[in-house]
Each structure stands twice: as structure tokens, then as C-alpha cells.
């Protein structure tokens, strides 16, 4: 890494959490990612979701067909975990270098998660196989129970699912807790071994729930997990600038049409691929920690 008065030079970053969608939306948003990133973990929550090796191969081919020829970009594919996922299919995809990881969505926790996991015992066999072969599990860490307050769902999930079940039953499973938004998430990762890590988005480093709600609802700042109190934003900033290798870049860039955001029931997700790297760099500069930026953006990660 080289830092001069007006310039920072780092190894080309990787994005460890990205939504590209499909069709015309994929074509429109892909150039923003390839302009900045070398590789990206591609989320599988399409309609229908990516649940098989064949699905992943076809989706990867569609992504690559939209590259403009000069981009050196590698999409890393994931498998959408359902109650009926076959451990053999997961293992085959991993060994054939089609699946990089498996994505766990609690059913109905976020966009296109209705096919997600409804009961944790339903996926015990898959997680056991993943632990055995060293395959990472990517987790949307929120409790989907409507009785749980939306601002408490991440902390509840950590206390009752990750701490209470997953890390207990599968102590060697490689887990990435994606897009953490809370001080509890930071402390959980710091308290665990090297097999537990987390991604942090650019937007959760710069907005809090006042930015979303105070003085009027701003739908383009609505995402899941939802922005929290400012103390949590500050905890995220301290975590990513600490040099701890368990925290790394994952934009969770999630494009939607304007009509899908500006409606009486707007979709969750913030599109940030066009300026994510600059936002991250600004945060590191504000924290007087530019020397740690390359580790977070380009070197840490699964």
C-alpha cells in the first residue's frame, strides 16, 4: 500500500457480499462492480434461487457474458440453503469449484428469502458436511420472528442461534456473519476463533437510524439489517480500523428499481457499488487509520 498527499494505491479489492440480480438489472449494475473489484461473492437470492450446481453454472455464465472483455473480474458463486438442500450437491459444487460458499437466509428475513431455512434442525446434515470439507457458511444474521423488534433481530440471532446452536454444534465450521450492524455483532466476532468473521457494508459505517427516519422516511436508506443507533455505527468503525483480520469488505450492494424503493411497501437494499470503495476510504481517513485500509479491502476475507 502506498499513501501520498492526494492518492492511495492498494491491491485491487474484493467484494465479499454482492447482489447483481439478473437480466437487464445485471447488465446495468455489473460495470460498477468490475470497475473497482477483482472478485465478488455473488448472492444466490434470485427468483427462483440458486440451489443447485447447474443453477450456479448458468448464472455464472450469464454474469460472464455481460463482461465487456477487458475486465479481469471473477464471480464467486454461492448456494442458497433451503430446508431440502442435499449435502452431496453442496459438496460436489465445492469440489468442482462452482460453489465458493453456502448462504443461509432465515426464511422471510430479507429480500427473496421465502425459500430460506425454517427450522435449524432441517439443515444439520448440510452444516455437518460443510464443517467436514471446510466450506464457508455465509449468514444473514437476523431472527425473522415478527414478534422480535426489527432493531433487535441481529442481537437476538447472535445470542439464540449462533451462540446457542451453530457454534456449539459445529465448532470448526467457517462462518461469515454478513453485514453486521451492531456492537453485539462486533463483540461476538472478536470473542470467537479465527473461523468466525464478518463483513461490514459502507452504508452501515455512515448512516444511523436517524438518517433513515428523522424528519421523514428516506426509502433509499432502507436496508436489512436496518440501520441502528449511532453507538453501533461507531462500534463498526472501530472494528474495521483495528487491524483485526476477522472483519472485511462486503458492500451488500443491492440494486432495485426506483419504483420498488419509492412505494408504500418499499424493498430493502442500498445500491452502493458505484462509490463503495470511496466511502470505505473516507471512513478510514476519518478514523486516522488509512494504513489499515488495504488489509480490510484487499487482504482479509475467506
Locate the predicted segments by residue.
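Divalent metal-dependent hydrolysis catalytic cores, especially in the metallo-beta-lactamase
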Residues: 15-16, 29-54, 70-82, 99-112, ...
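His/Asp/Glu-enriched, well-ordered alpha-helical/loop segment
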Residues: 168, 241-302
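Histidine-centered catalytic micro-motifs
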Residues: 12-23, 137-143, 200, 251-253
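Conserved active-site and cofactor/substrate-binding residues in soluble primary-metabolism enzymes
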Residues: 24, 28, 51-54, 121, ...
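Histidine/acidic residue-rich metal-binding segments in metalloenzymes
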Residues: 3-5, 88-104, 112-249
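Short, acidic/polar
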Residues: 23-30, 84-96
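Glycine-rich loop at the start of a catalytic domain that most often binds anionic cofactors/ligands
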Residues: 53-61
Amino acid at each position: 500500500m502506498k499513501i501520498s498527499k492526494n492518492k492511495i494505491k492498494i491491491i485491487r479489492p474484493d467484494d465479499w457480499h454482492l447482489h447483481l440480480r439478473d437480466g437487464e438489472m445485471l447488465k446495468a449494475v455489473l460495470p460498477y462492480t468490475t470497475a473497482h473489484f477483482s472478485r465478488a461473492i455473488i448472492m444466490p437470492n434470485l427468483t427462483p434461487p440458486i440451489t443447485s450446481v447447474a443453477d450456479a453454472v448458468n448464472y455464472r455464465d450469464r454474469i460472464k457474458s455481460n463482461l465487456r472483455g477487458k475486465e479481469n473480474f471473477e464471480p464467486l458463486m454461492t448456494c442458497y440453503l433451503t430446508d431440502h438442500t442435499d449435502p452431496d450437491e453442496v459438496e460436489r459444487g465445492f469440489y468442482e469449484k462452482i460453489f465458493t460458499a453456502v448462504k443461509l437466509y432465515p426464511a422471510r428475513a430479507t429480500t427473496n428469502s421465502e425459500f430460506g431455512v425454517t427450522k435449524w434442525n432441517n439443515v444439520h446434515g448440510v452444516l455437518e458436511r460443510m464443517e467436514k470439507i471446510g466450506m464457508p457458511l455465509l449468514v444473514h444474521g437476523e431472527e425473522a420472528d415478527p414478534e422480535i423488534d426489527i432493531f433487535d433481530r441481529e442481537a437476538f440471532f447472535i445470542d439464540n442461534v449462533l451462540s446457542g446452536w451453530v457454534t456449539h454444534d459445529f465448532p470448526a465450521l467457517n462462518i461469515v456473519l454478513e453485514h453486521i450492524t451492531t456492537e453485539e455483532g462486533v463483540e461476538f466476532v472478536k470473542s470467537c476463533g479465527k473461523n468466525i468473521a464478518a463483513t461490514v457494508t459502507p452504508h452501515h459505517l455512515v448512516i444511523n437510524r436517524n438518517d433513515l427516519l428523522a424528519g421523514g422516511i428516506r426509502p433509499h436508506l432502507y436496508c436489512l439489517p436496518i440501520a441502528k443507533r449511532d453507538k453501533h455505527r461507531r462500534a463498526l468503525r472501530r472494528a474495521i480500523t483495528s487491524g483485526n483480520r476477522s472483519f472485511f469488505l462486503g458492500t451488500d450492494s443491492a440494486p432495485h428499481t426506483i419504483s420498488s424503493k419509492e412505494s408504500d411497501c418499499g424493498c430493502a437494499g442500498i445500491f452502493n457499488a458505484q462509490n463503495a470503495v470511496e466511502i470505505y476510504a473516507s471512513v478510514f481517513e476519518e478514523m486516522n487509520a488509512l494504513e489499515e485500509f488495504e488489509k480490510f479491502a484487499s487482504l482479509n476475507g475467506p
